[in-house]
Amino acid sequence: MKQGKKFNYKVEKAAEEALQYLMNKQFDNASEIATKNLKKKHKHPVFLFAKSVDALLQGDETLFRSEFDKLFKLSSVRYTDYHNFGVFFQQHKLDVLAVECFSACVKLKQDFFEGHEQLGNSIFNLGEYESALGAYATALILKPKSKELVISAGKCCTKLGHYSDGLEYYQSLLPDYPFDSNVRTGVASCLISLNRESEAVAFLGKDIDKSYEPEKDYYLLSLVSYNNFKLDSALKFAAKGHELNPDYLPVLKMYGTCLGRLNIHSLAIDILKKAIEKDPNDPEVFYNCGNSFQGIGEIDQAREYYFECLRLNSEYYLAFNNLGFGYSFQGDVGKAKECYGIAIELTPSREDFHSNLLFTILHEEKSSPEDHFREARVWQDKHAIPIDQRVKEYKFNPDEVKKLRIGYISGDFGDHVAVYYWLPVAQQHDRDKYEIFLYSQKPREDDFSKSINVEIDKVCDQRRDVSGLSDEELCEQIVDDQIHILVDLSGHTAGNRLRALSYKPAPIQTSYIGYPATTGLDSMDYYITQPFSVPLEHEDLFSEKLAHIAGCTSYRVRPGAEKIESKELPYKENGFITFANFNRAGKVTSECMRAWGQILQQVPNSKLMLKVNRLDEDDFTNDFYECLDDLGVERGRLILRTRSDFLLYLEEINEFDLGLDPFPYNGASTSLDLFYMGRSFVSLTKGRAFHENIGASLLKFFGQEEMIVSSVEKYIERAVWAANNMEVLEEDRLKLRSFFLTEVAGGGAKVCASLERAMDVMWKRYCDGDKVDHITLDGIER
């Protein structure tokens, strides 16, 4: 309204209605009012603004700009109009336009506090924190006691990395607002950023029961614990915050995330679904929910959440990595490699993604051990530390060492199958001669892990959680611990720290148990194995030198298994033969499926029992059904069982007569579990790779050489032969368990003694300055 012009109540009322419609996103109503009044030549700024918004909604930026610029030429525009226009743009996340409006607002009225405040807010939203701080500073001159402004200024300082200034802003509010959660968490956040974390935690803990919104305080405490890998504490704080306010979104997300990380997946899914209802646009929540579905074996359901995560953020590389895991687990190696490839392309520095790709190659039907070796060397070229950056001096004098320090590093200390191979050996170490250090990369805090960790703690002199250490910090820790021989138990499996080991933090470094192939690293000196698993003539498949030790392997079943009896083969009672494979689907290739289908063809009325992720059909089951259809085998001859706890799984082994080993990646612990339950299996040895010969190695050790074959045709023939000679398998049933208990579960002392002799050879060679070379067994150890 021009200065001096008579106030027109009807026009102002119409303008007020149009503005209200705009704010409520009722754009058609606003446009109708604006058009009607503009025809009457009522050039009120609000009507012109409404027409410019019309152009914006139609995507005509040129027309919008033309109409919008007319506003700034009107002398009748009031500072409140500019403020209202700015608020509209702010609500629609058009902060660039909001800044134009708020700037015009404070130019017309320099002492308009709200204009400076909102100008600062929009500039903040644009990420221009220095300019935002300037706007807030101007507003604070006008209203120095404004709590909201001081908090906003503090946020700007933290965004700029000026944590001391931010702390000063927040602390200035404490005398008047000692229990305001926004003030308290602001103070604590700045303290944390200033490396005064203990002060922050103590500050938040004090008077938390008096805090106005304690869920915010608990959320920050949970976040601190989470970032320090203290997952139990993180869960405790998040749970308390959730109890106090189940609708507070940050704590809801944190609670679900902590539950998932601690393998409490069912509750995690429930909580994260609630978070998604409140915020359907956060890719991280979809990702974490997918992780929990994957954690309970619901791979297809997990995939849906990963896809939704990627819809929201097409470069969310973690989702691609986990999609790769899911496809690999279900046996779709092609899609797994594709997903890992995308993840690696998005983040070339993530060596763990590259390790996942390497592990997947082992499952590939057409790949060779040479393919894996070449890719492992590529991993070294891309991720390992250059030779000139390796540790050059160690903090000990070899001549003064009286007791060897052995370091074991793994991502699997806890309830993981690798531990059940390692623990029977580790329990036999001569503690007078060897000092044992453990480096745990992936804390496992579930109930089963807590139980087994009690045993693990007894076999070591020092155990360190290194999951929060960088590669450089981990290297420094190992050097400071003066480790003489470092034994990696992970290889390229999850949780490995091979990049840290490429620094060569110990003078002797070896790979053992966890990975059935080479690491590909020159910094790893030895690969510890048995001669019939990896003979010397396969040395070209390893960058490491081979260190042969005695026995077959050491492995024990989980507690409670001693109560599970081996029952007679069920073929007599059933009236038909039951074959089985309890390995994960990722090991079952299409060639494998077809061979099993042909066995069913040739053994009338026989059935095949499989472990699957879900009883309703998934991709793996559908592929198997299609294979059976193609062979003319009834689908009903497939018996599906879901994954179960270990003791039930052992009971289920009693329900079949003969195992069928997958190929080319053979079973390992599953095959040993079969022996424990008195079941044998047919195994195909196809090539030179370790993982292609695991089944043959175990069968030889158990005196079951007749079950080893060298072609798919012979694999089928041997299974058919076994079906016709069940009495032979029944005769061996109890012998297999007895041999397992004495030579495998009870073989830890023999294996450990041989391992220690090999370590002594390694140490002597190092002290004498001899080159690293193969270590072979003498006649006695064989």
What are these regions (language model features)?
Residues S440-E445, L608-N622:
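Glycosyltransferase donor-sugar binding loop
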Residues F656, D673-T685, F702:
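Conserved donor-binding/catalytic loop of nucleotide-activated donor transferases
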Residues G678, I694-E706:
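Acidic, glycine-centered active-site loop in nucleotide-sugar glycosyltransferases
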Residues M1-F576, R594, D629-V633, S644-F656, ...:
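Alpha-helical solenoid repeat scaffolds of the TPR/TPR-like class and their adjacent stem/linker regions
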Residues E435, N605-K607:
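Residues at the starts of beta-strands that form the adenosine-phosphate
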Residues T493, D661-T670, L684-N693:
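Nucleotide-sugar-dependent
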Residues I409, F582-R584, K611:
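Short hydrophobic "strand-cap" motifs at the C-terminus of beta-strands
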